[in-house]
C-alpha cells in the first residue's frame, strides 16, 4: 500500500505568520513598547505577539463612542490569562489572584471555560508587576493564548480521586512539556538577561520559528463526565478505567468550535476517536500531533488554520497513518467508554480519599461581590483557612476541593454566612448555562453574552416553571461572536451573537457533548427567542420520551436535522 503524500495548502503566508517570522521568537518590540508612556495601547504587530505571553490588548467598548467624541484614544486595558493546567489552584494562589484583581484589575476574577483565571482591566503600566506577582506564586501566563498549545484541561471529578490525581498530573506534564522554549517571556516580564543563541542552537525544536498556524487545545476527560467537552478539543484523551484503575486513554483528534458568520467553509467540528494508548505514550502522541499541524496546517488563511480543517482536508485515516509513522508504533484499538453529561455536579461530595469537595455555582464564571451576594469576599475568607485546593471547572464553576473532615464544618459555616450557592435554588437550566465575556471588553463580540444571558434566563425560567421543567437539565450557552469560547455548538440551546441584541439560535446538541447543534433561527431578538421557546418547551414537556434530553427531542421530533459531522453543520 502506497502511503499518501501529505501537503500543506498553497498560498502566501498570512500577516500573522509574517509577524511571527520577524519576531525573534515572540519578542518583537514588546519590551520597548510596554515602556512607552505616550499611549496606553501597543501597536497591532506587538499585540499579535502579546497573545503568546497570555494577554490581549482590549478597550472598554462601553466608553468607545464617548472617548471618540472627546478625541481621546480608546480606554485601553489588558486581559491577562493564567496558565493553570487542570484548573487547580492553591489557597495562596487564589488569594494572590484576588488581590491582583483589586490592585490592578477591575475588581473581579473571570473563571474561564478552559479552567483558568482571567484578570480584566489591567493598565499597560501595571502589566509587568502583575505578571511578576503571578510568577511569585509559581504560576505564569506563558502560552495561555496564541498559536501554541493552550491551557490543558482535565475533568474536575471528585468522585474518583485517585484517577483524577493521575489525570491531573498528566495534564500538568502535557502543559509543561508542550511549552514554547523561547526565553522571550522571561526576558520581557521577569527581567531575565538575554543570552545570545549560537548558530547551532535550535530555539524551538518542536514548534519551530513560526509556531503553529493557530491555537491548539488539549483536554483529558474521565468518563462518565464529559465536563471538558473532550470532542471540542484539537486533541482529546478519554480515560479508560478498569477495576478503578487508569489503564490508558482513547485518543481523539480534530475538534474545535470556532467559525465565521456567512462562511460555510468554516464550521465547528467534533474530534474523532482514532485509537487507544497507554498513559506513558500520551505526551509523545501530543508532541507528534502538534508537529503534524505545524507541518501541514494552513498558514495562508487563518480562519481555516485550526487542526480540525487539517484533519478534514487530509483525511482522518491519512493523519492517523502519519501520526503512527512519526511515533514509530501503532495505536491500539479504541476501548469502550460512556459519557452521560457535560455539566457539573453541585454541592458536597466525598472523595474516596476521605476528603470532601464542594462545587459552587458561579453564574457566568464571574467572581465579584454583588450588592446582595458577597461572593468574592466569601471565597476569600474560605481561602484564608482552607488547606486544600480550588478547582476551576470547564463550566465556569468552582470546587472547594480536598477539604479535610475537621475543616469541613468551619467551611460550611462560611458557606452559610456568605450564602455561597450550590445553585439548588436556581433552575437546572440556569445551572447548565455558560457564557463568554463578550461586551464590553472583548473586541470580537458582536452582541452581549455574560451580561445578558442571566436576564434572558430569568424570562425563560417562567416558561420552564409553567411546564414543570425546573429540575430538568438543559444546556444553554451564549457567545458574543462565532469563535465559540463558551462552546455554543455543544449547547442543547445555543446562541451566537450576530449584532447588538440579535443572535443566531441553535438547537439539537447532545447532552453528553457528542453531537453538534443545528441552526434553528437566524438573527432573532429576545421576543422571537421567547416565542420560539414558548412553543418548543411545552412540546418537550408533553411529548418527550422517558429520560429524553431536550437536544435529542428536537432532533427526534424533526424540529432540526441531526448534525452528523461538522462538515454538514450548515446543511439545513
UniProtKB/Swiss-Prot annotation:
A molecular function GO annotation: 4 iron, 4 sulfur cluster binding
The entry's keywords: 4Fe-4S, Amino-acid biosynthesis, Cysteine biosynthesis, Heme, Iron, Iron-sulfur, Metal-binding, NADP, Oxidoreductase
Catalytic activity, reaction form: hydrogen sulfide + 3 NADP(+) + 3 H2O = sulfite + 3 NADPH + 4 H(+)
Binding positions for [4Fe-4S] cluster per the UniProt entry: 436, 442, 481, 485
Cysteine pairings via disulfide bonds: none
Reported cofactor(s): siroheme; [4Fe-4S] cluster
Keyword set includes NADP: yes
Binding site for siroheme: 485
Cellular component annotations (GO), alphabetically ordered: sulfite reductase complex (NADPH)
EC number: 1.8.1.2
PROSITE patterns for this protein: NIR_SIR
Gene3D superfamilies to which the protein is assigned, alphabetical: Sulfite Reductase Hemoprotein, domain 1
Keyword NADP on entry: yes
Pathway(s) where this gene product acts: Sulfur metabolism; hydrogen sulfide biosynthesis; hydrogen sulfide from sulfite (NADPH route): step 1/1
Cofactor note: Binds 1 siroheme per subunit. Binds 1 [4Fe-4S] cluster per subunit.
EC class (word): oxidoreductase
Pfam families, per database record: NIR_SIR (PF01077), NIR_SIR_ferr (PF03460)
PANTHER family: SULFITE REDUCTASE [NADPH] SUBUNIT BETA, SULFITE REDUCTASE [NADPH] SUBUNIT BETA-RELATED
Primary role: Component of the sulfite reductase complex that catalyzes the 6-electron reduction of sulfite to sulfide. This is one of several activities required for the biosynthesis of L-cysteine from sulfate.
Record note on quaternary structure: Alpha(8)-beta(8). The alpha component is a flavoprotein, the beta component is a hemoprotein.
Family, per entry: Belongs to the nitrite and sulfite reductase 4Fe-4S domain family.
Protein name: Sulfite reductase [NADPH] hemoprotein beta-component
Organism listed in the record: Bacillus pumilus (strain SAFR-032)
Record lineage: Bacteria, Bacillati, Bacillota, Bacilli, Bacillales
Amino acid at each position: 500500500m502506497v502511503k499518501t503524500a501529505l501537503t500543506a495548502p498553497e498560498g502566501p503566508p498570512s500577516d500573522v505568520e509574517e509577524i511571527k517570522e520577524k519576531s525573534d521568537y515572540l519578542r518583537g518590540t514588546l519590551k520597548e513598547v510596554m515602556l512607552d508612556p505616550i499611549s496606553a495601547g501597543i501597536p497591532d504587530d506587538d499585540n499579535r505577539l502579546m497573545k503568546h505571553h497570555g494577554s490581549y490588548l482590549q478597550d472598554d467598548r462601553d466608553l468607545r463612542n464617548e472617548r471618540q467624541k472627546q478625541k481621546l484614544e480608546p480606554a485601553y486595558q489588558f486581559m491577562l490569562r493564567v496558565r493553570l493546567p487542570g484548573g487547580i489552584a492553591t489557597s495562596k494562589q487564589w488569594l494572590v489572584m484576588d488581590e491582583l484583581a483589586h490592585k490592578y484589575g477591575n475588581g473581579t476574577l473571570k473563571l474561564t471555560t478552559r479552567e483558568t483565571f482571567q484578570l480584566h482591566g489591567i493598565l499597560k503600566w501595571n502589566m509587568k508587576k502583575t505578571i511578576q506577582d503571578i510568577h511569585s506564586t509559581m504560576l505564569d501566563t506563558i502560552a495561555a493564548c496564541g498559536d501554541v498549545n493552550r491551557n490543558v484541561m482535565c475533568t474536575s471529578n471528585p468522585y474518583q480521586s485517585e484517577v483524577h490525581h493521575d489525570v491531573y498530573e498528566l495534564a500538568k506534564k502535557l502543559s509543561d512539556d508542550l511549552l514554547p522554549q523561547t526565553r522571550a517571556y522571561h526576558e520581557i516580564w521577569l527581567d531575565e538577561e538575554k543570552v545570545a543563541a549560537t548558530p547551532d542552537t535550535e530555539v524551538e525544536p518542536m514548534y519551530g520559528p513560526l509556531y503553529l498556524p493557530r491555537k491548539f487545545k488539549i483536554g483529558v476527560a474521565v468518563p462518565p463526565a464529559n465536563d471538558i467537552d473532550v470532542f471540542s478539543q484539537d486533541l482529546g484523551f478519554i480515560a479508560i478505567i478498569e477495576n478503578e484503575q487508569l489503564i490508558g486513554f482513547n485518543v481523539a483528534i480534530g475538534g474545535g468550535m470556532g467559525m465565521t458568520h456567512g462562511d460555510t467553509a468554516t464550521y465547528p467540528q467534533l474530534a474523532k476517536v482514532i485509537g487507544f494508548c497507554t498513559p506513558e505514550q500520551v505526551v509523545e502522541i501530543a508532541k507528534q500531533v502538534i508537529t503534524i499541524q505545524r507541518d501541514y496546517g494552513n498558514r495562508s488563511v487563518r480562519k481555516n488554520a485550526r487542526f480540525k480543517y487539517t484533519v478534514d482536508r487530509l483525511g482522518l485515516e491519512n493523519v492517523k497513518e502519519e501520526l503512527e509513522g512519526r511515533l514509530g508504533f501503532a495505536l491500539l484499538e479504541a476501548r469502550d467508554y460512556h459519557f452521560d453529561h457535560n455539566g457539573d455536579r453541585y454541592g458536597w461530595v466525598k472523595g474516596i480519599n476521605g476528603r470532601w469537595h464542594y462545587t459552587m455555582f458561579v453564574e457566568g464564571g464571574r467572581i465579584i461581590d454583588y450588592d446582595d451576594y458577597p461572593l468574592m469576599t466569601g471565597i476569600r475568607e474560605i481561602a484564608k483557612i482552607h488547606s486544600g485546593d480550588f478547582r476551576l471547572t470547564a463550566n465556569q464553576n468552582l470546587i472547594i476541593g480536598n477539604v479535610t473532615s475537621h475543616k469541613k464544618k468551619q467551611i460550611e459555616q462560611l458557606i452559610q454566612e456568605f450564602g455561597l450557592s450550590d445553585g439548588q435554588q436556581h433552575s437546572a437550566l440556569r445551572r447548565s448555562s455558560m457564557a463568554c465575556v463578550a461586551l464590553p471588553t472583548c473586541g470580537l463580540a458582536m452582541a452581549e453574552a455574560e451580561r445578558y444571558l442571566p436576564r434572558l434566563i430569568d424570562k425563560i425560567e417562567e416558561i420552564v416553571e409553567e411546564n414543570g421543567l425546573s429540575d430538568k437539565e438543559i444546556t444553554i450557552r451564549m457567545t458574543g461572536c462565532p469563535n465559540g469560547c463558551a462552546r455554543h455548538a455543544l449547547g442543547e440551546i445555543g446562541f451566537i451573537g450576530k449584532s447588538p441584541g440579535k443572535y443566531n439560535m441553535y438547537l439539537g446538541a447532545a447532552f453528553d457533548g457528542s453531537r453538534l447543534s443545528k441552526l434553528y433561527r437566524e438573527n432573532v431578538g429576545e421576543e422571537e427567542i421567547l416565542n420560539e421557546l414558548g412553543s418548543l418547551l411545552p412540546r418537550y414537556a408533553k411529548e418527550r420520551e422517558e429520560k429524553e434530553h431536550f437536544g435529542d427531542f428536537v432532533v427526534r421530533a424533526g424540529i432540526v436535522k441531526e448534525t452528523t459531522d461538522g462538515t454538514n453543520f450548515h446543511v439545513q
